[in-house]
Amino acid sequence: MKPGIHPDYRPVLFHDTAADVYFLIGSTAETTRTHQHTDGNTYPYIALDVSSASHPIYTGKQRKTTTEGRIAGFNKRFAGFATKK
């Protein structure tokens, strides 16, 4: 590989804020924030909204969806709205 043209691959601390779980993973992601990990070292820090620790597909905590669509729900909610005086 040519020197100086590749991004810096280093350990990065990813934080799933929904589940409050930290992942230390090798990455080239750029960030200016840092955070001290449980091992005592300071790593670049990236906050995540969703990861495998909090996503319903991976956790098994899926919610059931209703069978009626959005339009049917709208019509049901506002069915008598135009007829009221």
Curated annotation (Swiss-Prot):
GO terms for molecular function: structural constituent of ribosome. Coiled coil: none annotated. It holds the Pfam family Ribosomal_L31. InterPro entries: Ribosomal_bL28/bL31-like_sf, Ribosomal_bL31, Ribosomal_bL31_B, Ribosomal_bL31_sf. Gene3D superfamilies: Ribosomal protein L31. The keyword Ribosomal protein applies. Keywords: Ribonucleoprotein, Ribosomal protein. SUPFAM superfamilies: L28p-like. It comes from the Bacteria. One of its GO terms (biological process) is translation. GO terms for cellular component: ribonucleoprotein complex; ribosome. The keyword Ribosomal protein applies. Part of the 50S ribosomal subunit. Belongs to the bacterial ribosomal protein bL31 family. Type B subfamily. This is Large ribosomal subunit protein bL31B. The lineage of its organism: Bacteria, Pseudomonadati, Pseudomonadota, Gammaproteobacteria, Pseudomonadales.
